[in-house]
């Protein structure tokens, strides 16, 4: 059975979300390609929102 590769943009989004939950800066985006970078930043924004709304404001 052939394994299917994960969508690169979905992976970038997830990595950005997780980076925000860990309190990393958006300047730490590891992607050079524009589309992947935009997805990473979108995930980062969502993660930052989740980070602040879940009562974790003290760690920012």
UniProtKB/Swiss-Prot annotation:
Pfam families on file = RMF
Q: Which UniProt keywords apply?
A: Cytoplasm, Translation regulation
BP-aspect Gene Ontology terms:
regulation of translation
Give yes or no: UniProt keyword Transmembrane helix: no
**Biological classification of the source:** Bacteria, Pseudomonadati, Pseudomonadota, Gammaproteobacteria, Kangiellales
Its GO CC terms?
cytoplasm
* Similarity comment: Belongs to the ribosome modulation factor family.
Summarizing the function annotation, the protein's role is: During stationary phase, converts 70S ribosomes to an inactive dimeric form (100S ribosomes).
Location comes to: Cytoplasm
The protein in question is named Ribosome modulation factor
On the tree of life, the source organism's domain of life is Bacteria
Q: Which gene encodes it?
A: rmf
